Amino acid sequence: TNEFIRFASSGIFEFYKDVAKVKCGADKLLASLKEQNIKLCLASATAMSEVKYALECHALSKYFDFVISCADIGIGKDRPDIYIKAKSLMGIPEGEICVFEDSYVALETAKKVGFQTVGIFDRYNFGQERLKKSSDIYLDENQTLDCLIAMIDNK
């Protein structure tokens, strides 16, 4: 029913506001990339209203040039459509795009169409061993995004 959907949605917004945390070093990494004028697109499987809410709650909107959702595309990340749309929006060849994912299904989809990939551990997603195996770079549970900042700053 609509009442249940409203109730469930309100719980999701509370989760993003009170429970969900920004991954360690993510804000520094985004700031570093933005300072270097690197285009950033957030391509999420989450509904756009929830994505925008989460970005605002954590003051991350300012880093992204584009934000797209699978709901807008009409298909999940098991198909490359959202990545192809992101590439089109950014105007960059796939070989120059790096996709960050915590889902092995999404990461493998991006990799199949030629994107570089960074797998990021997420305790809420199963298949971490497969994610690690499929990633060009993998950041484990105890690693932070700070190591990527150092790699980018040294280029």
What residue ranges belong to the model's regions?
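Short, acidic loop-to-helix structural element flanking the phosphoryl-transfer center
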Residues: 10, 14-42, 48, 52
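Asp-based, Mg2+/Mn2+-dependent phosphohydrolase catalytic module
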Residues: 31-34, 47-48, 52-155
